[in-house]
Amino acid sequence: MLRDMFGYDTISMIDIALYGQFSENNYNGVNCGIMDQFAIAMGKKDCAIFLDTSDLKYEYAPVKLEGARIVISCSNKKRGLGDSKYNERRSECETALAEIQKVKDIKSLGELTEEEFEAVKDAIKDPVRQKRAKHAVYENQRTVQAVAALKANDIAKFGELMNASHVSLRDDYEVTGIELDTLVEEAWNCPGVIGSRMTGAGFGGCTISLVRTDDVDNFIKKVGRSYRSEERRVGKECRSRWSPYH
C-alpha cells in the first residue's frame, strides 16, 4: 500500500515489514515479532519461508503438496492479542532467557539445541517459565527439521512435526484452548490427515491441516459436524476452507 498508493518505491519490502512490526509493538500494544509481517511482505508462491528473526536472513523452502491440500479451519473465537496472554508469554520467555544467560553465553533461546537446553534448564527457577522456554527451544528445532522435510518432499515427516508442534503449544506454551484443541484433535481422527496444528498466536483463531485431496470433503464435513456437536461446550461453529494446492 505504501508503494502503490503513496509512491514510496525506494522502501524495501523488508523495511515495510519492520514498519508493520513497529506499529504493532508501539501502537497496538502487542509485543510481537516480525514473522507475520515478513511473510506478507516476502511471501513467494509455492514456498515457505525459513526466517532467522535475529538477523532477518531467510531462504525459501519448496512446498510441493502433490495429492494433498491445505485446509484452514476457523474456530470463530475472536481474540485481541493485546488483551490476551500473548505479551505474558513473551515476558516469560525473556525472563527464562535471562536466567539461562547466567550460566550460558547465548543471545536467544533459539540458539540452544534440545540437549543444551536440558543441561541448563534448572537455571530457570519457575517450572512454568521452564515449560515456556522448552517450547521455544524445541519448536525452533522442529522448524529446522520441517525445512529439511520440505526440501526432501517428505510431507509425512512434515505432518508429524505439525502434530508435535500443537502438542507443545497446548502443553508447554499453553496458548491453544478448548476450541483449537477440539478442531485439531478431531482432525487427527480423520482419514487422510497428514498433520494438523493451531496457527497464529493462539487463544482462538484458526487451525491448519494437511489433508489428502480425496479426503478433503469428508474432512470438512466430519470436523465441522464434530465441532458443532460440541457447540454447547465451546459455543462456536467451525468454518473450513481448502487451498488450491494439489
Model-derived features with residue positions:
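Conserved phosphate/anionic-ligand binding catalytic regions in large, soluble enzymes, centered on
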Residues: C32-I40, R197-C206
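Positively charged, low-complexity/disordered segments
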Residues: G235-H246
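Glycine-centered loop/turn positions within well-structured domains
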Residues: C47, G205, S240
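Short, small-residue alpha-helix embedded
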Residues: M1-M5, G204-V211
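Fold-level recognition of mixed alpha/beta catalytic cores in primary-metabolism enzymes, strongest
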Residues: M1-I72
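C-terminal nucleotide
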Residues: M42, C47-G195, L210-R233
